[in-house]
């Protein structure tokens, strides 16, 4: 959690420089969204696994704890949307969704594809049809193939290289195109 927070801070300036070529709007980078998504997962686990008892029925208490576990995820998603985190509520919801379905890959794929179609379908309803929404929907759905095929084994230990890639490539693109 701390590592994601630190990389969110480090990556913010390169992100703002790159983003300034396209818009004057302020937003937080993807590491901020990943940080908030992980925080939502940690809070969900903490709340849903707590031993808070409303009644003597353990199954009922467990169900209530799980339901209350969703509250921080929803609130953090709303905060992400209001505070202009990259991908906003959608980003936090998808991170949480992947965690929630971590042991059910087929369920994850079905839910994710359905969520993508609904998201871009709503955009078409609100803003009118544009082929770009179809391309965005397809581009959003395609990565689920790689997620589905992931075998759960850690790859080469190049974690910090991958972390560094994000701000470095944004700076390179900024200086090349500015």
Where are the predicted features?
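Alpha-helical transmembrane segments and their immediate juxtamembrane cytosolic regions
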Residues: 1-178
């Amino acid at each position: 959690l701390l590592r994601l927070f630190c990389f969110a801070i480090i990556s913010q300036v390169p992100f703002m420089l790159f983003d300034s070529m396209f818009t004057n709007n302020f937003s937080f980078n993807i590491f901020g969204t990943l940080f908030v998504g992980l925080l939502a997962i940690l809070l969900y686990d903490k709340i849903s696994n707590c031993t808070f008892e409303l009644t003597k029925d353990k199954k009922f208490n467990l169900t209530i704890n799980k339901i209350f576990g969703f509250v921080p995820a929803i609130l953090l998603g709303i905060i992400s949307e209001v505070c202009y985190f990259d991908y906003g509520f959608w980003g936090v919801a998808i991170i949480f969704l992947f965690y929630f379905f971590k042991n059910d890959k087929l369920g994850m794929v079905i839910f994710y594809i359905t969520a993508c179609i609904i998201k871009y379908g709503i955009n078409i309803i609100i803003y009118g049809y544009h082929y770009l929404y179809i391309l965005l929907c397809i581009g959003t759905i395609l990565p689920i193939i790689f997620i589905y095929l992931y075998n759960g084994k850690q790859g080469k230990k190049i974690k910090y290289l991958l972390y560094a890639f994000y701000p470095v490539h944004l700076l390179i693109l900024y200086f090349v195109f500015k």
